[in-house]
Amino acid sequence: MNWGLVMQDICNVRCDAIVNAANKIMLGGAGVDGDIHHAAGPELVRYIENNVPTIGVSEADEAVPIRCDVGMAVTTPSFGLQPVCKAIIHTVGPVWTGGRKGEAKKLAKCYWSCLDEAKARGFKSIAFPCISAGCYRFPTNLAADIAVRSVCSWFKRNPDSDIKVIFVTYTVADNEAYENIMPYYTGK
């Protein structure tokens, strides 16, 4: 398994695909989602509106179409992010509500779905933010542990894969969470 950890803006990480911690409507939002949409440009929203089918409507507002549900992965071109990356893999992480509603399992599914998507598309490298740790209030240490554990378990089920995984953090605290947990899974 080939992986790394960097502290920088995910929009500047050179790789085949960056992962967007998206919302269900996929049209941009706060945090990483907003940053990626801003960097990709308005073509990304137009592409999503015209090419990504809706799978339902919001429970809060039936006029709001859902294009990606929790744990799913949807790939789009990267538009303004090229040549930094070829594609954006959007996934919707769970909102933290205390840990009693299957949030950990749902978060793990995000990583597995993104890696499955990367493998299916022949990508050789993928950059992950700490999904759900920002606006969705997942405790950073737990989110980092689930991220690393999920990636390790995916590679155990896909030993032939040579995808490079890059964990991308924005803050020193986030970076330290990964630095503290990664040795438990690498034996170093």
Go through the PLM ranges and name each one.
Residues 1-188:
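Macrodomain-like recognition of ADP-ribose-binding/processing modules
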